[in-house]
Each structure stands twice: as C-alpha cells, then as structure tokens.
C-alpha cells in the first residue's frame, strides 16, 4: 500500500516503480481528471512503465469534439497526452454506458416511483451497455495482455428502449410505462439551454448530455468490438443483469455496488 495524494510526485514514483502496467480508476471533476492523470502518466513515463490504462470506461469519446460533451473532455485530453509520452503506451477501455448507471436516478431513464421508462427520440435508438463487473473483468484481462494497447472496445449488450422494456417484462412480469419526452433534436436543444444558464451546475445538465450521446449514434462502439479477444469472459446482457436484481432494488443497484 502506497499512501499519498494524487499530486504527490514522490508517492506516485514509489507507486509505479517496477510496474509493467498501471490501471487508473480516478473519478472527479474535470481539473482532477486531467491534472491527476497527467501526474500519474508522467510518473509512469519516468519509470518506463510499459502501459497506462486510462480512467475512461465509457462511450467512444474519440468521435466527439472538445466541448461536445464537457464531462468527456478529460478523456480526450488524456488520450492526446498519451500520444506524446516517450515510454508508456496508453490503453483506453470503452464499454458504452454502465448498466447499473442506466438504472440509477443519474441517467433519468428509469423512474421506479412511476414504473416508467422515459426516453428521447423514436425509441429505436440503441443503448450500448456493460456491467461494472464485466468492465472490471475485461480490464483485468487487458492488464495481463501485454499486447493490448490503444483503444479496446467491449460490450455486454445493445438494446433500444422498447427491447429493454420487454426484457423487464420477461424478468419481472411487469410492463413498464414508456414515455417519450421529445425528439433527439428536442433533447439537444434542452440540454444546451440548461448548460448555457450555468455550466458549473453539472448535475443540472449531465444526465441530458449522457442520454444524448449514448443514443445519437455519434459515439457508438459496437462496430469494432474486442470481446472475441477474451472468450472466457461472457458479459451479461440486459436480461442477465436484470436477473441479478429485484425490481425494487433496481434503481439503487449502482449505489449498492459502489458501497460494497
């Protein structure tokens, strides 16, 4: 165990000394995600660590421009930063949206109090998603595979909101209500209006940007997956994941996971 702050250069150097690969799982605001990762990457580069697994675990942000989805700007900046290192090579794991996050209040899709799925668009837009557990398993496999560098794309399932509702009905015997809130263009307009009022109020706009870029097709990962590289990992589908939770605890599955 190496104790120290994320900006403690001496502690970072002790931490990475002698390592072949470093897995970053930082989570914080944009300044932290950029500067703390840069400090860790610099320590890895000085120590000639072979690979650095960036704290990504999301949709394909490489298809976005800076500023499109502000919460993903740090990923783009770190991706570029790793192109300039002398020794350490970057690894970027993309998994779509976490399934547990999809069900949480953070996403604003599943509303347990009204037994409803609220969506934007036609409803035919697919959600690409992977569980936290499967993302961790793929990350461990990547860490053990010295040939794995660059972008690595994995997916548990790909379903639209109607198919997800069918999966819920099949699992729980309950048909959720489906409520369309507007077109994708409506969503884009609303999210930018809210963002423009107060960009610092991240919780006012984050879920809307999250929904938009998860389903508008711009940042999809399913066209070039790496699942087949690790055939021993059988990722859960939406149905599989639903089967591990009862309906009442579904919306808290992310918090329960993170607290355990």
Predicted regions and their residues:
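Short, amphipathic alpha-helical "lid/cap" segments that border enzyme active or binding sites
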Residues: 13, 19, 132-140, 235-243
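Oxidoreductase cofactor-interface core, primarily capturing Rossmann-like NAD(P)-dependent enzymes
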Residues: 7-10, 30, 47, 58-177, ...
């Amino acid at each position: 165990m190496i104790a120290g702050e994320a900006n403690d250069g001496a502690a970072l150097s002790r931490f990475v000394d002698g390592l072949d690969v470093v897995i970053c799982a930082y989570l914080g605001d944009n300044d932290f995600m950029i500067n703390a990762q840069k400090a860790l990457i610099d320590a890895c580069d000085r120590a000639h660590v072979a690979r650095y697994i960036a704290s990504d675990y999301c949709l394909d942000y490489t298809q976005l421009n800076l500023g499109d989805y502000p919460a993903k700007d740090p990923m783009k900046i770190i991706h570029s930063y790793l192109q300039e290192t002398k020794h350490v090579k970057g690894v970027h794991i993309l998994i779509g949206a976490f399934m547990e996050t999809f069900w949480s209040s953070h996403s604003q899709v599943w509303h347990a109090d009204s037994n409803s799925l609220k969506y934007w668009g036609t409803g035919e837009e697919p959600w690409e998603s992977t569980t936290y557990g499967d993302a961790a398993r793929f990350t461990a496999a990547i860490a053990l595979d010295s040939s794995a560098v660059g972008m690595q794309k994995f997916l548990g399932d790909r379903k639209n909101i109607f198919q997800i509702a069918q999966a819920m009905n099949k699992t729980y015997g309950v048909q959720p209500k489906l409520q369309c809130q507007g077109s994708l263009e409506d969503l884009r307009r609303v999210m930018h209006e809210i963002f423009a009022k107060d960009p610092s109020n991240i919780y006012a706009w984050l879920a809307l940007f999250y929904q938009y870029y998860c389903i508008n097709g711009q940042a999809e990962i399913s066209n070039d997956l790496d699942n087949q590289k690790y055939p021993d990992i059988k990722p859960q589908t939406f149905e599989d994941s639903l089967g591990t939770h009862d309906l009442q605890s579904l919306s808290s599955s992310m918090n329960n996971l993170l607290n355990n």
